[in-house]
UniProtKB/Swiss-Prot annotation:
Belongs to the GTP cyclohydrolase II family. The active site is at D126, R128. GO terms for biological process: riboflavin biosynthetic process. It catalyses: GTP + 4 H2O = 2,5-diamino-6-hydroxy-4-(5-phosphoribosylamino)-pyrimidine + formate + 2 phosphate + 3 H(+). GTP binds at R49, V50, H51, S52, E53, Q70, E92, G93, R94, T114, T149, K154. InterPro entries: GTP_cyclohydro_II, RibA, RibA-like_sf. This is GTP cyclohydrolase-2. The keyword Metal-binding applies. Its cofactor is Zn(2+). GO terms for molecular function: GTP binding; GTP cyclohydrolase II activity; zinc ion binding. Keywords: GTP-binding, Hydrolase, Metal-binding, Nucleotide-binding, Riboflavin biosynthesis, Zinc. It comes from Klebsiella pneumoniae subsp. pneumoniae (strain ATCC 700721 / MGH 78578). The keyword Zinc applies.
Length: 200
């Protein structure tokens, strides 16, 4: 186990009242958060979203990505479902950090795509470690998940880490002229499924 559960409190939102659960990485002290809605106990699969931190999209309303749109849509879907979890994964910029993300944006402004920009900075296309999220699910006693994602790699990694992903639920929102090339690149080079139906 790479994390410990350290604190929790109620978090009222426009979609309803969530329970905010804080986790801390044992090795680094980095914090992560889960937002839990309703009763997630029991054997039935839980609707969940693993959402990686995106300051620009989540808090600053950037149109360069679909992150903020996905965050809002996921919370809305979870509330409509009546139960579910959003894991807020503190690995900004696909885990290259905020300043390197700004550098990557500058390269994109020069014509590089999101993958090429990461490579120019010496990073892989995606540096995230989703095994931390598997530990968060385990600390919340969740074993079966209906995962809100367009990223099959997330499904694969969480499955390998012991989480039973019984369904992939697409979350296709927020496409606009400013992020169309970015989304097309994620589909073409990173395998994201952006025109798909749920899989079981």
């Amino acid at each position: 186990m790479q994390l410990k559960r350290v604190a929790e409190a109620k978090l009222p939102t426009p979609w309803g009242d969530f329970l905010m659960v804080g986790f801390e990485e044992l090795a680094t002290g980095q914090d992560h958060v889960a937002l839990v809605y309703g009763d997630i106990s029991g054997q039935s699969p839980v609707l969940a979203r693993v959402h990686s931190e995106c300051l620009t999209g989540d808090a600053l309303f950037s149109l360069r990505c679909d992150c903020g749109f996905q965050l809002e849509a996921a919370l809305s879907h979870i509330a409509e479902e009546g139960r579910g979890i959003l894991l807020y994964h503190r690995q900004e910029g696909r885990n290259i950090g905020l300043l390197n993300k700004i550098r990557a944006y500058a390269l994109q402004d020069q014509g590089y795509d999101t993958v090429e920009a990461n490579h120019q900075l010496g990073f892989a296309a995606d540096e995230r470690d989703f095994t931390l999220c598997a530990d968060m699910f385990k600390l919340l006693n969740v074993e079966q998940v209906r995962l809100l994602t367009n990223n099959p790699k997330k499904v694969e990694i969480l499955t390998e880490a012991g989480i039973n992903i019984v369904e992939r639920v697409p979350l296709i929102v927020g496409r606009n002229p400013k992020n169309a090339h970015y989304l097309d690149t994620k589909a073409a080079k990173m395998g994201h499924l952006l025109n798909s139906k749920p899989t079981e």
